[in-house]
Amino acid sequence: MAIIKKFRIKSFKNKNSVVEFENISLSYGNRLILDNLNFKINEGQIFGMLGPNGVGKSTIFNLITGLINPNNGKIKITGQNVTGYPIYLRTKKFKLGYVPQYGGFFNDLTLHDNLKAISEIVIKNKVYRSEKVNYLISKFELDNLKDIKAKFLSGGQKKKLVIALSLLGEPKVLLLDECFAALDVLTIKMLQETIVNLQSESKITICICDHQARDLLACVDEAMILSNGKIVAQDTPSNLVNNINAKNAYFGDNFKFN
């Protein structure tokens, strides 16, 4: 039995949408991956996508960034139709940040040198570049790890590093792909707090995809559940756990909220 004791409670009814899918469908050959998806991610929201592995969550991220394009439908970012925009133009113009499930850093560079290397690509001003690197190391409480090679960091420390790397470009939208996967309970809690604090302080829009309901729902404002290429439910976490479609598709009857 999974028990969640507290949900975030925030309203986004009057906020502008940052990412919007309109009638998006995608097929690979004869296999239908996404079937007429319609949803919005609002400004300043922590939005979650929940579903089993292979349901299309990472595919949605690839569509948002422009790595792939849909067969049908429109993708809008801040109200502008970006369907067909190449990935480099889309990520730069709309300031999209992406944190992959695996990797995203240089194994044989120290934590500090990872940040320094990427900062030299995305930040022109040398003084600000150094300040930004030091700020992120301090913000994520990585000071005592900055001289350790990335390959020797723990799972949670690597996640913090990759998130810090993604923030060097000062994104307005941050996509986190399976960020809780293969982490222990205490590390997951730490990462949840990091994500919530990041949004609260920077007002960034964050979208997380994951396959574990208890991990995702504890830190998002709204979530949608995917099954067989469709959205079967979308609501606040507290409403989702009581949604019959969500229970039938994903939670089961033993998922409770106290």
Per-range role (PLM):
Residues 19-21, 34:
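Conserved structural motif at the start of ABC-family nucleotide-binding domains
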Residues 50-52:
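The feature captures the beta-strand-to-loop junction immediately N-terminal to the Walker
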Residues 65:
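Helix-to-loop junction immediately C-terminal to a conserved catalytic motif
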Residues 82-97, 102, 240-244:
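ABC ATPase NBD coupling module
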Residues 102, 109-120:
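Q-loop/switch helix immediately C-terminal to the Walker
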Residues 127-145, 196:
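Conserved ABC ATPase "signature" region
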Residues 149-153:
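Conserved ABC ATPase signature
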